[in-house]
Regions:
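Short amphipathic alpha-helices and their capping loops
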Residues: 1-38
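Conserved catalytic core of two-component histidine kinases
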Residues: 29, 192, 203
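Short, well-ordered beta-strand elements
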Residues: 199-207
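AMP-binding/adenylate-forming domain of the ANL superfamily
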Residues: 7-8, 35-53, 121-125, 179-200, ...
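His-Asp-centered acyl/peptidyl-transfer active-site segments
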Residues: 1-10, 37, 55-63, 67, ...
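A short N-terminal helical cap/helix-turn-helix that marks the beginning
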Residues: 16-23, 134-140, 144-146, 214-241
């Protein structure tokens, strides 16, 4: 009997996440009594041309580069050689959905690992393969992934390309308005947003768990890691200061 797509997808996720006990959410530096939302943003000084050129050299997309760098940063924050977090993607892995108007965004788990001799290129290539395979097997939902492997979305990274607050409709421009919740969606959400060829880091976080200075340090470390990655061969050589 032919194996169903759901079971095949489950076996794929087994091959990546079964038995993993990595905890990458940074230890809180605060212990507030009531959950509160914090928000920070930082414009990165790196030029788009340098990022795109580096992506071409590695043979990966900007999404993989930025996501992979976050994995490295979280591993270093945990003093480990691996990291575990979640990400999102548009859910449009079928060409028939290209022009469909609906909410298809899905959450995926991400597992990053390296050793002292792992090159940045090999690390990014492996992550790219994992991400493409995870998207291809997204019939196995994140809720089932969490239930089976004990994962969660407490630590999430997202790359948002070419964002705009203005939307042309005929001869007019519709102005977008932020309708964010007044509570953080998870303890820590880091995003890279691209506006007019400039990369902006944003952090949405539980301010009862993390101080502004702590989160600001993470954003500074992320930019430092990217600057370092552009000039190094090995993952272990990437500096976050």
């Amino acid at each position: 009997m032919k194996e169903g797509k759901y079971k095949k997808a489950e076996k794929y996720y087994d091959s990546i996440f079964e038995g993993i006990e990595t905890e990458s959410l940074p230890m809180p530096d605060l212990n507030g009594k009531a959950p509160e939302k914090g928000y920070l943003e930082k414009t990165m000084g790196l030029k788009e041309e340098a990022i795109l050129s580096y992506c071409e050299k590695l043979g990966v997309t900007p999404n993989i580069l930025f996501t992979g760098l976050f994995g490295i940063l979280m591993a270093k924050y945990s003093n480990a050689e691996d990291s575990l977090f979640s990400t999102i993607y548009n859910g449009r892995n079928d060409s028939r959905l290209e022009n469909t108007v609906c909410m298809l965004v899905k959450t995926l788990p991400v597992y990053c690992k390296f050793d002292p001799k792992t090159t940045v290129q090999a690390y990014m290539a492996e992550l790219s393969e994992q991400m493409l395979s995870s998207m291809a097997n997204d019939i196995f939902p994140f809720s089932d992934i969490c239930a089976k492997y004990g994962l969660n979305s407490d630590l999430t990274f997202a790359y948002q390309a070419e964002l705009s607050d203005d939307y042309p409709i005929g001869d007019t421009i519709a102005r977008g308005h932020d309708l964010s919740l007044d509570m953080a969606k998870m303890p820590l959400l880091i995003q890279v947003r691209e506006y007019n060829h400039t990369y902006v880091l944003t952090a949405e976080y539980r301010s009862d768990m993390y101080s502004q200075a702590f989160i600001d340090g993470i954003l500074d470390s992320y930019e430092a890691a990217m600057s370092s990655a552009l000039k190094t061969k090995l993952v272990s050589e990437i500096s976050v200061i």
